[in-house]
Amino acid sequence: MRFLTAGESHGPELLAIIEGLPAGLPLSEEDINPWLEKRQKGYGRGRRMVIERDRVEFRAGVRGGRTTGAPVALAIKNADFKNWAEIMDPAPGNWPRKRALTAARPGHADLAGGMKYGHKDLRDVLERASARETAMRVAVGAVALKLLSLLGVEGVGYVPGMAGVWAKVPFSWDLVPRIEESPLRMTDPEAEAEAIRRIDQAKAEGDTLGGIIEARFRGLVPGLGSHVHWDRKLDGRLAQMALSIPAVKGVEIGPAFENAMKRGSEVHDAIYWSPERGFYRKTNRAGGLEGGMTTGEELVVRAALKPIATLMKPLPTVDVVTHEPKDAARERSDTTAVPAASVILCALSAIVLAQAYLEKFGGDTMEEIQERVERYRERVRAY
């Protein structure tokens, strides 16, 4: 399964083509739209989330509520485009452009992208580098999550800590309803209240905040990924996908950085066996991956999200046209997008997992894949 996205932040729409989905996957807009809604929620978001009401539209590959085996085409319209139609006009002659951006923003793609592609209006960088693109990747991830759900896999994204505040209530699958209702997708109401206070303070001061996001999956079969080739190792693929999220600057599988400061005897998960459970672990400090493959334990992917780079009290920069000192450009932005980023991490991790399932089990139809997964589960139980 592979996919491609297109579209700009203030263009008419976002687009995606997904190739390699099996025929017979039940799929409707209601499998995708709730994930788009989750991405738009979260305390600390900006006015753009008031304007947009993201809804997916199928353009190809789905008929009668099921995939046909052909490429699936998705679209999400940008409601804000009506306010930018003249500025984003693709027709020749639309130069010099209105609202040209020449003051590169520190922490953004503006300067490096401008130098790479020769743009003096940095809007040509900003529009595609924007995190708005992740709306479509969440839609693709929702399709992957639907496929995984039919294979017995469940995923969730949440926030273990942000704005310098750590949740003291550890994650539990029983807390998923609480996470879904939380404005910050946190497990701990007290930590949440303090984080909200800090978000309000940062907003009043024209500043931004980052945090830690985590995606968890249960129900995975062991053996997804491979130890044979470096590019098939699942932890590497998950890390690349996580680091492709705008503002994510670090990733770990399980408590990797904590593990790095301990002895091996304190870190590695002992192996046990019983007739009822087969092989299992009493701990999961590996985060569900060993040797580039799933172990069958819960998969834990954690990432660090830096504070958003667009500041209402901008940092010093230089104008790329005049080379004169200037304050960085200000665009409408969020104070924090950490809760939304946890949803994005879950969706994007699901894409990697769906790809791994399809690579291992193949099949042109969903029914074939389900049968092969069940036979594999039986073989693993008998191992």
Curated annotation (Swiss-Prot):
Molecular function GO labels: chorismate synthase activity; FMN binding
Cofactor binding: number and manner: Reduced FMN (FMNH(2)).
Cofactor names: FMNH2
Pathway annotation: Metabolic intermediate biosynthesis; chorismate biosynthesis; chorismate from D-erythrose 4-phosphate and phosphoenolpyruvate: step 7/7
Residues engaged in binding FMN: R128, A129, S130, G291, K306, P307, I308, A309, T310, R332
Recorded catalytic activity of this chain's protein: 5-O-(1-carboxyvinyl)-3-phosphoshikimate = chorismate + phosphate
BP term (GO), one: amino acid biosynthetic process
SUPFAM superfamilies: Chorismate synthase, AroC (SSF103263)
Main enzyme class: lyase
Keyword hit for Lyase: yes
EC identifiers of the protein: 4.2.3.5
CC per GO annotation: cytosol
UniProt KW keywords: Amino-acid biosynthesis, Aromatic amino acid biosynthesis, FAD, Flavoprotein, FMN, Lyase, NADP
Keyword Translocase among UniProt keywords: no
Binding-site residues for NADP(+), renumbered to this chain: R39, R45
Description of how the protein assembles with itself and partners: Homotetramer.
Entries under HAMAP family matching the protein: Chorismate_synth (MF_00300)
Function of the molecule: This reaction introduces a second double bond into the aromatic ring system.
Record-stated family: Belongs to the chorismate synthase family.
NCBIfam families on file: aroC, PRK05382.1
The protein's name: Chorismate synthase
Species of provenance: Thermus thermophilus (strain ATCC 27634 / DSM 579 / HB8)
Gene from which this protein is expressed: aroC
